[in-house]
């Protein structure tokens, strides 16, 4: 892997709420304005001098593998694909660990950025988190929250609670599914993540940051109104199209 940072992109999920669009492909292979979500995100990362990627595949992995192979040639970058063989019964915690454990076992010295593969963002968000000196998570401090939002409560720099079931009134904002872990925190991150997986293989990796915030200085990178969305269903897909039409045209 390279000098700077590694970007981990999670692309294992089945995207059932987007069928028939995802009958044959994982969500990150969906196109908006003739560009796949994964290609757009890779380009956002390349703008921050990130040229090393780990993509976690699962559902329809052959197509994702082929796409990554094509993109690595097109942009002259390194993309390592690792398959989550249990993609249909696990969640993002297991997918994330496949990547972060690989980084630790190979003694890579880089920090990593962790990105949900169905995220569509204003590129400034990637710029802001890339520049963080500490481990960091991106928090939307503006959006009106709902039951589905991955909310968190932050007090004195520590995450007191994180999850969907937090009261909207108490919440400090929504975790948008983009984070950074510096190499010095990698061991702690992996130990916490492992424990979370042992508790429940259906857990989200997001919970890792609660305990990590007690062990290290976490930075909260605020969106301050910068646009983003994750694509879970057709409404989100439409929202992402509208957002990109404004950002890219």
Regions found by a protein language model. Name each.
Residues 13, 118, 233:
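Active-site glycine-centered loops adjacent to acidic/histidine catalytic or metal-binding residues
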Residues 122-198:
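Conserved core of the sugar-phosphate nucleotidyltransferase
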């Amino acid at each position: 892997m390279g000098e700077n940072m590694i970007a981990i992109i999670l692309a294992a999920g089945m995207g059932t709420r987007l069928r028939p669009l995802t009958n044959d492909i994982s969500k990150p292979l969906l196109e908006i304005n003739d560009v796949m979500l994964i290609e757009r995100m890779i380009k956002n990362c390349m703008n921050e001098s990130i040229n090393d990627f780990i993509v976690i595949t699962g559902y329809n992995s052959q197509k994702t593998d082929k796409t990554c192979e094509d993109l690595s040639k097109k942009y002259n970058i390194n993309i390592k694909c690792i398959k989550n063989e249990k993609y249909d019964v696990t969640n993002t915690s297991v997918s994330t660990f496949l990547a972060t454990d690989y980084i630790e076992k190979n003694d890579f010295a880089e920090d990593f950025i962790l990105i949900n593969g169905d995220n569509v963002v204003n590129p400034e968000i990637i710029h802001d988190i890339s520049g963080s000196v500490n481990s960091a998570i991106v928090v939307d401090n503006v959006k009106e929250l709902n039951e589905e939002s991955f909310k968190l409560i932050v007090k004195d720099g520590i995450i007191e609670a994180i999850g969907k079931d937090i009261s909207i009134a108490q919440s400090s904002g929504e975790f948008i599914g983009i984070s950074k872990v510096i190499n010095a925190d990698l061991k702690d991150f992996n130990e916490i993540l492992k424990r979370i997986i042992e508790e429940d293989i259906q857990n989200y990796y997001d919970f890792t940051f609660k305990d990590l915030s007690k062990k290290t200085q976490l930075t909260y990178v605020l969106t301050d109104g910068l646009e983003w969305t994750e694509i879970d269903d057709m409404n989100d897909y439409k929202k992402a199209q509208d957002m990109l039409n404004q950002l890219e045209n």
